[in-house]
């Protein structure tokens, strides 16, 4: 299955742009695929298989952090714009707004030079001027420990060096991100320690989307 998948069907969200956000390995791609199938939307996935920096980044993070983040920003901007230009509803596995979380954590851990980080932030802000926002972001709320467990279970060689400390820092940064982004984009927080039924999640998204509420916590 490629980065994009179109399925048939109609729903109250047929023209909605839904972003699925969360830590590494929590199940974003699986939920994005299921939601797309259920709601009759197009699914867009993270550019993992053809990421030319992925292996190098995990092998020598400090050396490749800037190149990796710029590569991902470029690819995700392209995907984001394709969704907008298509004029159709879509579910996106990780939004472009989350990229800045990873860049800031890399800087804080001394794995990205402050000069490179400032260049990255400037580039991100310039691109942001041309972006229409998603209609809603679904945040899959998972502990760093559960994220680490799921990463181990899927056994991707390139992810073998991901530490629990890195995930803890990411989780803290995500919490700040969710508060900030909810000021401009409706956010639905879904407890995801245990996988939930797609239909139940879709119903919650539909209800919250039509209400246009911000920073809602969905308990399933």
Feature locations, PLM:
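Conserved lysine of the Walker
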Residues: 28
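P-loop (Walker A) phosphate-binding loop of NTP-binding proteins
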Residues: 23
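NTP-dependent small-molecule kinase module
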Residues: 2-5, 148-220
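Glycine-rich phosphate-binding loop used to anchor ATP phosphates in small-molecule kinases
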Residues: 64-132
């Amino acid at each position: 299955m490629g980065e994009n998948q179109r399925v048939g069907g109609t729903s109250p969200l047929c023209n909605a742009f839904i972003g699925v956000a969360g830590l590494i390995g929590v199940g974003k791609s699986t939920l994005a695929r299921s939601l797309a199938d259920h709601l009759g939307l197009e699914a867009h996935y993270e550019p993992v298989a053809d990421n030319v920096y992925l292996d190098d980044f995990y092998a020598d993070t400090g050396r490749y952090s800037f190149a990796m983040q710029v590569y991902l920003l470029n690819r995700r901007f392209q995907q984001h714009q394709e969704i907008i230009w298509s004029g159709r509803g879509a579910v996106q596995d990780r939004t472009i707004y989350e990229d800045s979380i990873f860049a800031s954590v890399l800087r804080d851990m001394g794995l990205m030079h402050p000069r490179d980080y400032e260049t990255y932030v400037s580039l991100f802000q310039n691109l942001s001027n041309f972006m229409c926002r998603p209609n809603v972001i679904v945040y899959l709320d998972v502990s760093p420990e559960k994220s680490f467990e799921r990463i181990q279970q899927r056994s991707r060689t390139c992810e073998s060096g991901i530490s629990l400390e890195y995930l803890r820092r990411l989780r803290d940064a995500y919490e700040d991100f969710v508060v900030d982004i909810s000021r401009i984009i409706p956010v639905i927080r879904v407890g995801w320690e245990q996988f939930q039924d797609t239909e139940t999640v879709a119903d919650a998204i539909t209800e919250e989307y039509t209400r246009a509420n911000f920073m809602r916590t969905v308990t399933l």
